Amino acid sequence: MDLPGIFIQDEINLNEWQKLLLGIRYDYNSIHGNVFSPRANYKWSSIDKNEIIRLSVGNGFRVANVFTEDHAALTGSRSVEFKDNLKPETSWNGNANYIKNIIFKESILTLDGSFFYTYFSNRILPDYESNSNKIIYSNLDGKSVSKGISLNVDVMFQNGLSLLAGATLMDVSVIEKQVKTRQLLTERFSSVWSISYRLKSLGVTIDYTGNVYGPMRLPLLGRLDPRDEYSQWFIIQNIQFTKKIRNIMELYVGVKNLLNFTPPSNSIARAFDPFDKKVQFDNEGQVIPSSNNPNGLTFDPSYVFTSNQGIRLFLGLNFTIY
């Protein structure tokens, strides 16, 4: 496949505090033909540079590589099926961002808020639900929308303490045949925080970070599947201590996943039978519930929504070479 292209953009200074950036990209795909991708960005900043507004809109084009991007296709637990020839995904996206810096005597407060909206056509999504033994890939016969808002608060103090907290509320949905469904393995709410403090006398920096994830809709293997349809709320917390040595080396040590959170033990269905040797199938390849498999399950790791690694210690060195 050949993909020559050209990109042109022009930045226009409307005045001292307003800028407009216009661009267009042209690609010729030897399989899919001519592709045009325009974009526009607007920026306004206050005279003192403590307030900034950014607006952007643009079009995107992407040829999906399923086996590189979706590792679920490589687990071997399900056969992979493609419906027809996959068309490239296209999208239109818009974003509005506002930043406000507030300067105090001994600290700086930064507020950062964004609204984003992306409309996809020809979206390629894995279908886990039509057949529990397959992952079916096809272009969506409808549309997919990802929209949401995010807010970040960042505070930096002169004494070496810095605080960061952010939250994102999203609606990622698929609309097909006028039916709206929530996309699998996507959370509506997520949050992040970071607390950093430098002990100048010791040359040590302490970083405490964490993430909060809301429930995700998960792929089940059928109506008899005993696992929950949605994941629980969960938090991942980490702490790290960094010691700087003579400006050329950093020694760091820390703990990941302080609360030792792991997904439920039954997240991988029938993990004890990865080749389905004890599973009975009918002539159409559907699972038949039996005495040793009353829920009619097969080996399947697609339900796993976060890392199976619990609490763990790490240690390392960073060298700076001038």
Positions of predicted regions on the chain:
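Signature of Gram-negative outer-membrane beta-barrel scaffolds
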Residues: 1-50, 63
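Gram-negative outer-membrane beta-barrel transporters
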Residues: 13-19, 111, 116-119, 139-220, ...
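Outer-membrane beta-barrel channels and translocator barrels
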Residues: 15-17, 45-49, 91, 103-106, ...
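Membrane-embedded beta-barrel scaffold of Gram-negative outer-membrane proteins
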Residues: 45-47, 53-54, 87-139, 143-147
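C-terminal beta-barrel architecture of Gram-negative outer-membrane proteins
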Residues: 174, 185-246, 259, 264-268, ...
